[in-house]
UniProtKB/Swiss-Prot annotation:
InterPro entries the record matches: Trp_synth_b_CS, Trp_synth_beta, Trp_synth_beta/beta-like, TrpB-like_PALP, TrpB-like_PALP_sf
Family as reported in the entry's similarity comment: Belongs to the TrpB family.
Pathway(s) this gene product operates in, as recorded in its UniProt entry: Amino-acid biosynthesis; L-tryptophan biosynthesis; L-tryptophan from chorismate: step 5/5
Modified residues (N6-(pyridoxal phosphate)lysine): 88
A GO cellular-component term linked to this record: cytoplasm
Annotated keywords: Amino-acid biosynthesis, Aromatic amino acid biosynthesis, Lyase, Pyridoxal phosphate, Tryptophan biosynthesis
Organism: Haemophilus influenzae (strain PittEE)
Record protein name field: Tryptophan synthase beta chain
Designated gene of the protein: trpB
GO MF annotation list: tryptophan synthase activity
Coiled coil: none
Job of this protein: The beta subunit is responsible for the synthesis of L-tryptophan from indole and L-serine.
Superkingdom of the organism of origin: Bacteria
Entry's EC annotation: 4.2.1.20
Subunit structure: Tetramer of two alpha and two beta chains.
Length: 397
């Protein structure tokens, strides 16, 4: 792997742990990506799609009511306003343009909450590419509005009945398909994880989130925030927010993992803080595994955070102490979901509600502290209203 164009590692994390057959395919992808990054025509087409199709830049909204009685200013980066309803659309457009550049004629993807699947389906419809989405059977059930959306836009949705019937199983099936069809097919990975060069590609195609946030907050407040906060599953919305702030040492980077029913119960999705390093999904990164190295099932109320590993750049930022990673339970996320809806008229995705919950916790801990916080509101909550309704009005998810 010494002949990759870009460094495949972040510290000791990352790499390209895939079947031999996929190594040339990943190198072809890396080559195409490096060329595209230096091609003004590609960049112009990507920028045009982001602006005129997806609706960038997204707003930076000051919360008027949530912080009443405190000295905190809390802003939300509104990725929920992006076409498709979440940050996923950003990098999907970039990857499909890359796939076309490589002459691929078919797109496959995995999805958990269905947001990446929806983003892939809408971009494939618009850019005229056939599309197959693998989704855990359990997620197909709990995210039915998104399944309908994908099918409406022409995607073939394959429910995966293996293992825990969730995101990790969908990832495995997508990998299998890709291994058999790589000559014609691009695997449009949905998060900043997996084998090199995916974590780097996804970061580069999401980093406009942090770049815009920096410009907008300087315009509004004349200074950088004290902290930016984002939810972490695989880690794409968080790395998109963090990337442009990594070199700003006065800005705290806070990633929020799902504590599920409580870390102590074992039913969570917090491998960064409560997992061990291993090889999974083509990369070396923290994973939830038992003492024999078997992957354990992660759990979160939020399908998009229900993943037993995490992107390698987050593992590295955690190791060097540049970013802080914390966890929030289902219950705390549900409370934040309701608070934002009730007090600001914005219904957030359950994923984003984890980040918001931690921001609210910080504010409550020290209401007299003057601080400027930005939460990445990575997606809208339409897809979650049935799940939340079920929990709040009897029954469980």
């Amino acid at each position: 792997m010494s002949d990759t164009l870009l460094n495949p590692y972040f510290g000791e994390f990352g790499g390209m742990y895939v079947p031999e057959i996929l190594v040339p395919v990943l190198k072809q992808l890396e080559q195409a990506f490096v060329e595209a990054q230096n091609d003004p025509t590609f960049q112009a087409e990507f920028a045009d799609l982001l602006k005129n199709y997806a609706g960038r830049p997204t707003a930076l909204t000051l919360c008027r009511n949530l912080t009443k009685g405190t000295k905190t200013k809390l802003y939300l980066k509104r990725e929920d306003l992006l076409h498709g309803g979440a940050h996923k659309t950003n990098q999907v457009l970039g990857q499909i343009l890359l796939a076309k550049r490589m002459g691929k004629t078919r797109i496959i993807a995995e999805t958990g909450a269905g947001q990446h699947g929806v983003a892939t389906a809408l971009a494939c419809a618009m850019l005229d590419m056939p599309c197959r989405v693998y989704m855990g059977a359990k997620d197909v059930e709990r995210q039915s509005p998104n399944v309908f959306r994908m099918r409406l836009m022409g995607a073939e949705v394959i429910p995966v009945q293996k293992g825990s019937c969730s995101l990790k199983d969908a990832c495995c099936e997508a990998m299998r398909d890709w291994s058999a069809n790589y000559e014609t097919t691009h695997y449009l990975l949905g998060t900043a994880a997996g084998p090199h060069p995916f974590p780097t590609i996804v970061k580069e195609f999401q980093k406009m989130i942090g770049e815009e946030t920096k410009r907008q907050i300087l315009e509004r407040e004349g200074r950088l925030p004290d902290a930016v906060i984002a939810a972490v599953g695989g880690g794409s919305n968080a790395i998109g927010m963090f990337a442009d702030f990594i070199d700003e040492s006065n800005v705290r980077l806070i990633g929020v993992e799902p504590a599920g029913k409580g870390i102590e119960t074992g039913e969570h999705g917090a491998p960064l803080k409560h997992g061990t390093t291993g090889i999974y999904f083509g990369m070396k990164s923290p994973i939830m595994q038992d003492k024999d190295g078997q992957i354990e099932e992660s759990y979160s109320i939020s399908a998009g955070l229900d993943f037993p590993s995490v992107g390698p750049q987050h593992a590295y930022l955690n190791e060097i102490g540049r970013a802080d990673y914390v966890s929030i339970t289902d219950e705390e996320a549900l409370n934040a979901f309701q608070e934002l809806a009730k007090h600001e008229g914005i219904i957030p995705a359950l994923e984003s509600s984890h980040a918001l919950a931690y921001a609210l916790k910080l504010i409550k801990q020290n209401p007299e502290k003057e601080q400027l916080l930005v939460v990445n509101l990575s997606g809208r909550g339409d897809k979650d209203i049935f799940t939340v309704d079920k929990i709040l009005n009897g029954g469980t998810n």
